[in-house]
């Protein structure tokens, strides 16, 4: 294994082990046998010191209104960068839904300085990847490159961001690809279920405008539409740049000043995303001949900025484990029942299951919600869930791209990037009473959608008085 790569792997492994040791310490209390350290057994760092150490790796600055977050990871062989665009679904409407996704996808095909063939040749030679993605709250133009080829990759990346070609041929190619992808959504039960769920959960909300668009809205868009939309979005007040890798912050500032920092500042001010409100339980059934019923139910959840997000994460993890135990392990009603918590500005959590016996499966899942609401969980259960959560979380943060995405998410919709690294103490502070409180507050008025056999669904089971 390359020595630098080995150091990077050992670094992330040490972070995980440190957090798990700290979790074990907090779970067990400060017993005398642990507290009395020997000279050869130094005390484990506190959560506060870990947070401070991680925060010190991040440098933030502004260039002409463009906020930049630079996280240095010494020894890393790769660099990840993302130019994030604020707004998401709030930027579009029912008539132009999908324009931002199409604009970013078409931009990566060619730019003024790097026509299609030249761009593909250079990116292939360096192993560099330029891509894009979008969600309800923001979109991103992304870069993944080796440290060796970062400077040249940055030139291409910024040319794509600033001077995309939007040729008729490129736009038509990407347009067709996106339309074909959307056209078969109803053929995939899981994808179709999510589409049905969005229509029910997001009625009257900006999220109803899908950033993916529809075949109809995408087909109406022309290159001139993309150029006008690009000009509108490329203002530093709308953008956030995040870079993670073994780079010098002053050098990064110089690169930004000579490229993205020359964009107009603009006057964009992000609007507060309205929170969702479900006033009652409901079930919407779409008939489809399938081997099993596909079922999902959503309830409102706290956003990342709310103190309730910490006990809600623990409650959702407990619910997931209990649902799996009751539905899959004990009764084998479904292969992969699930409880989940998303990370949106207007947030939701929910239940998911595929089952022939829809009523029994949902009844069991709702019973587990009632159990969380009425029976205090043990402190041991909470600490076990937190330890499991931390393991999964930090393993998921091994790559520079994942860390860049996490910093951006918290900066854009989570109250600031520092909240992405100081949640340990807040998770550890969750109490059994907190679990009961958030379960009662949020896990109610569930909006169910069912794709399958209507005759197998007792709507009374789905709309039972959970949490009421």
Q: Where does each model-flagged region fall?
A:
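N-terminal secretory signal peptides that target proteins for export/translocation
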Residues: 1-12
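Acidic/histidine-enriched segments that form metal/cofactor-coordinating
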Residues: 7, 20, 37-40, 45, ...
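Bacterial N-terminal signal peptides
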Residues: 16-29
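C-terminal regions of mature proteins
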Residues: 36-50, 240-245, 352, 383-468
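An aromatic/glycine/proline-enriched structural segment found at the starts
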Residues: 37-46, 203-207, 211, 236, ...
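M16/MPP (pitrilysin/insulinase) zinc-metallopeptidase core fold and M16-derived inactive scaffolds
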Residues: 82-147, 210, 318-333, 340
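M16/insulysin-pitrilysin zinc metalloprotease superfamily fold
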Residues: 109-113, 144-175, 341-396, 463-468
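Short acidic/His-enriched helical or mixed secondary-structure segments at domain edges of catalytic enzymes
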Residues: 177-196, 274-293, 329-333, 344, ...
């Amino acid at each position: 294994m390359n020595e630098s790569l080995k150091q990077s792997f050992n670094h992330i492994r040490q972070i995980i082990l440190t957090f798990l040791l700290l979790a074990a310490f907090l779970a067990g209390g400060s017993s005398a046998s642990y507290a009395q350290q020997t000279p050869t057994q130094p005390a484990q760092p506190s959560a506060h010191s870990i947070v401070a150490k991680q925060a010190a790796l991040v440098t933030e600055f502004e260039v002409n209104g463009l906020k930049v977050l630079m996280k240095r990871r010494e020894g890393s062989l790769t660099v990840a960068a993302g130019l994030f665009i604020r707004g998401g679904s709030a930027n579009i409407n029912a008539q132009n839904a999908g324009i931002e996704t199409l604009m970013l996808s078409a931009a990566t095909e060619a730019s003024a300085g790097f026509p299609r063939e030249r761009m593909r040749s250079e990116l292939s030679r360096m192993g560099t990847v330029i891509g894009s993605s979008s969600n309800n709250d923001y979109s991103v133009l992304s870069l993944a490159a080796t440290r060796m080829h970062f400077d040249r990759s940055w030139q291409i990346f910024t040319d794509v961001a600033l001077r995309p070609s939007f040729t008729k041929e490129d736009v038509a190619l990407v347009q067709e690809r996106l339309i074909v992808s959307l056209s078969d959504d109803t053929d995939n039960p899981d994808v179709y279920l999510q589409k049905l769920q969005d229509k029910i959960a997001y009625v009257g909300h900006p999220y109803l405008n899908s950033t993916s668009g529809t075949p109809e809205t995408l087909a109406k868009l022309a290159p001139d539409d993309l150029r006008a939309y690009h000009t509108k979005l490329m203002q530093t007040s709308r953008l956030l740049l995040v870079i993670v890798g073994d780079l010098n912050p002053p050098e990064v500032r110089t690169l930004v000043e000579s490229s993205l920092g020359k964009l107009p500042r603009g006057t964009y001010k992000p609007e507060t995303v309205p929170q969702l409100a479900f006033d009652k339980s409901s079930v919407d059934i779409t008939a489809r001949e399938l081997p099993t019923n596909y079922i999902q139910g959503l309830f409102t959840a706290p956003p990342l900025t709310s103190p309730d997000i910490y006990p809600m994460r623990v409650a959702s993890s407990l619910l997931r484990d209990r649902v799996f135990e009751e539905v899959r392990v004990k009764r084998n009603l479904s292969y992969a029942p699930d409880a989940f918590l998303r990370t949106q500005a207007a947030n939701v959590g929910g239940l998911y299951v595929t089952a022939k016996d829809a009523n029994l499966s949902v009844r069991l899942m709702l019973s587990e919600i009632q159990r969380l609401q009425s029976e205090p969980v043990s402190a041991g259960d909470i600490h076990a869930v937190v330890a499991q959560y931390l393991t999964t979380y930090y393993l998921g943060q091994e790559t520079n791209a994942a860390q860049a995405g996490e910093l951006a998410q918290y900066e854009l919709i989570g109250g600031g990037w520092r909240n992405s690294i100081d949640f340990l103490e807040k998770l550890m502070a969750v109490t059994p009473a907190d679990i009961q409180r958030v379960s009662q507050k949020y896990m109610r008025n569930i909006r169910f959608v069912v794709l399958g056999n209507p005759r197998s669904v007792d709507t009374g089971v789905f709309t039972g008085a959970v949490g009421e």
